[in-house]
Amino acid sequence: MTNNCKITFKNQLKALLGKAILLKKKKRKETITEFTQGIQYIIVLVILHYTIPNVITLNTYSPVGLGYPTSGFPLCYVSNVPFNQTSNLHLLLNSTQLPISQIVQFPNEQSLIDSYKSNPQSITYGISFNNIDYQNNILDYNILLNSTFQNTQLISIVQNLFLSTFAEIKGITTTTTTTLSSIEEFPNLTSSVSVSSYLYVIYLPLLFLFSLQQLLVTSVTERKNHIKEVMKVMGLKELVYWVTIIIVQTITNVINILLVMVVLYFTKTLTTSLNPVMLFLQFLLYSFSMVAIGIILSNLVDTPKTASAISSFLLLILVGVSCFYQFYLKSKTSSSWLRSILFLFSPCAFGEFLYKMGNDQQMMLTTNWSDPQVKISFLFLIIDIFLYFTIAWYITELYKDNTDENSITKSFTFFLSLSYWKSIFNLRSSSSSSSLPLLNNNNNCNNNNTSPSSSSSSQSSPLNKPLLSGDSDDDENDIGIRLVNLKKTYKNPITKETVNAVNDVSYTIKKGTILALLGQNGSGKTSTIGMLNGMRSPSSGDAFINGLSIKYDMDKIRENGIGLCHQSNILYDEFTCAEHIALYSRLKGLFVDGGGANGDNKRIMMDNFIMESLGEVNLVDKKDTQSIKLSGGMKRRLCLAISLIGNPSILLLDEPSSGLDSLSQHMICELLQRKKPNKTIILTTHNLDSAELLGDKICIMTSGKVKAMGSSLELKNQFNLGYILTIVYDKSLSLLQPPNINQQFESFFFNKFNDSTQSKQNLKNIQSFYNIFNNNNNENNSNNSDGSSSSSDSSSSKDVLLNIKNNNNNNNNNEERGFSSGQRDLELEYSLTHQSTDVITEFLEELESRQDEFKIKRISMSMTTLDEVFLKVSEEETINKNKQPTS
């Protein structure tokens, strides 16, 4: 089904937001925990707030000598003296010689406190006079001190002022010892150190810990399971992915913040004097910094459990630093540079506001926007958010082009490169990818050969006569994929040696072609697929997909349509088959929901498309089954259906038949054959039967090099593998016939097929055949076993044997091969290159008619399988490696 894909930022954002919401619904326990975790913290905070007794700390003040400067402090007083002592109070105040403008009277202490609350910075101290009697030497007063004022000697200054004035009025000239009866800090505090001062700074920064862990678990799991990267291969923009995470986390955090604030205000842990908007904005800014930290860690950590543990440890450490500063360093130093450095950690900047809030709540004061501590906290939180998101962008870009390996391939100064910004804004010249470089015919596959000096010694090896497609005169419009000296190297983490995963590979694949990529584990198949889909960056060389470079135009390649069936199952355990198809279809921009009747039609089209896609892989009956309940084969079929969404022109299938039964494999082969027109398909597989059935071209890789490439028949001819003819002589002939019993047959056979060869084991089998009976040499029994095992291996082809005539149908196979009682028939094998059916039929008919003449007991013929080609290539590679000198 062909569909017009509308890949836009908006459509992809809607698709991912829908996925996130659906995932939240599916994971109900985690979602409920995420929304209630903050309330659990706050409930503990409320309990501690109301159960832990206040710790009272008394400040000690020592008097200072007379003459200590007293100017500059406004005098606020309250008169509680009897009416007959009013004149005594006025005399005392006038004798202080303070300017009248600095003396302010309040009718009572409550009015003084209210004035202080409205503007704490305007009132430094206050005095409440209770009794002034000069005759009886009585001066009774209370000093109310602003506890936020930094000069702790102010109490002594005020005491000295009034005691010295009182002494002058009395005419006292000698030193008078005065006992200070009481000191009361202003306003009247319940404690000097309250629960709020500590618990806010400790508990509230941990409010978003669980939310941070959930962000990391989700994003790291999607990267670890390759879900994110497959989405990117299908056209997902990196920015859309992270914007979705920010939006989802912000919504989650806002709900958490509102719930927490309701609990705090409802339980009166916070008074209404604290502006709720200020508190909300502080929480919100701090939550943004946590999201940025989560994005940074998600790019650096490989497993969800490790990410969760690291985030917890990191946040606890930062909260500890914040507490150390607020409760210890702050009272020891007033260094602004130290504060600035610490406030670059958002828990420390947030802790500054929380400490101020706790003190104000303790003193029943209003926390104002103009307060320096509030301003500094807001300023540094904004700076932290900008800094953290910049670091997150930098880390993301470093790992962006090699996320399948989670390793750095870009330069650490990539942002200083002009080419980087050109690629960001699509300013790169199109000339670099407008025309494809032509392959050198001499380099099509033989680029991996040894030096010229060694070529002569291996001239006869089929590996030195590679058969490749991709001639230089191919029409560029017909080329789907072209690899040009593509190379990928790694550093072995243990030996530190350079490993060539893909070693200078060059070939082309035409449109409408299926290329089966074969090789042992570690041969470079997956690395090649990874470079073609952009999940791994090439070390050198390039590849062109529909004329676009994988190094410079990967975004365009993905936009134009590329399907990937990753070797891992890119599935969400909680989603059903239908939900997976719907998600990836929306990412591709298919059937985007609209309003009204048009929207209804698109939803109907989406439902029909889901049924069609699942029908192609025979999963309609599993439409509403969660993927975690599917078998391994069903998961692979679902992944294949996902890769076909949007009718991509390029299909990269990495082990699509893994875990499939024979019936499912046959069904997948038929599906790919139907989808093949106008598509370029590369599939890797270890199922050689499927490769032979599907592959228009078959490429065999070993040690990162292309060793052979061509159609199945071409490869068999290249390695002299077409048919295997097996003839058997009865064991009784060893006593009657001369040793050249097969000479007459071979003369006939090689006249018919002069390019055929006989098995190397034939000569040994003939020698053993006669030695057993004529010499009765027991030592040759071991040779018999060797010969029979070789011939058994040679005749163990998977195809159905064509039995022309069997003169002893009742004999057991093992008895025929001489494994019983040390006796066996003589078995000889001959290899024929691929021949037409008519030639083979004519030959077999003639051979059958002359079977008695040649004294042949049995004739069989099998067709060579791709397994034998694969084994030939592997054997040749092993021999070549053993011949190489070791350093």
Curated annotation (Swiss-Prot):
Localization: Membrane
Membrane topology term: Multi-pass membrane protein
Low complexity compositional bias, start-end: 443-469, 774-797
Record field: transmembrane: 38-58, 198-218, 245-265, 277-297, 309-329, 335-355, 376-396
Domain ABC transporter: 481-728
SMART domains per record: AAA (SM00382)
Cellular component GO terms, alphabetical: intracellular membrane-bounded organelle; membrane
Protein name: ABC transporter A family member 10
Gene source species: Dictyostelium discoideum (Social amoeba)
